[in-house]
Design a protein with these regions (language model features):
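A short Gly-Trp-Pro
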Residues: 1-133
Length: 133
């Protein structure tokens, strides 16, 4: 599978090859703050499968082991990478040219969900991560 996407202004573009995994709608406070949204859709790919095809994004360390990236021109959130899992990187689902092809498979960090966000879509819900339950 080949996935293409990029930022709002088009300055940063990427292509990812291979099978995406861990498609989720994250409700954690960090993702909400970084995106300015009530929840944020991510999917994972193998780090080696991600290639920047235009300008590269700006990166910043958002926590002890997390590195986020965004477009330095328009501010679009693009990636999240955890040092504890160096072989995978999360991409912002809505940054895909066709985000409809990767709907969320679950909700993560619902313990941090805003009370007015409705999660009655039948998808599995995890208090924190999938592995933590």
């Amino acid at each position: 599978m080949s996935l293409q996407g990029g930022c709002f202004c088009g300055a940063v573009r990427y292509e990812a090859h291979g099978q995406p995994f861990n498609s989720t709608l994250c409700h954690c406070t960090d993702c909400r703050k970084a995106s300015g949204a009530p929840a944020f859709a991510w999917f994972s790919v193998k780090t080696v499968s991600l290639h920047w095809t235009a300008s590269a994004p700006q990166r910043f360390r958002s926590s002890e082991h997390a590195l986020r990236s965004f477009c330095p021109s328009c501010g679009t959130t693009l990636t999240w990478h955890d040092d504890r899992w160096p072989d995978e990187i999360d991409l912002a689902t809505a940054s895909l040219d066709d985000p409809e092809q990767l709907p969320p498979a679950d909700h993560t960090f619902v313990r941090s969900r805003l009370n007015w966000v409705n999660c009655d879509d039948g998808l599995p819900q995890y208090q924190t991560t999938r592995s933590s339950g």
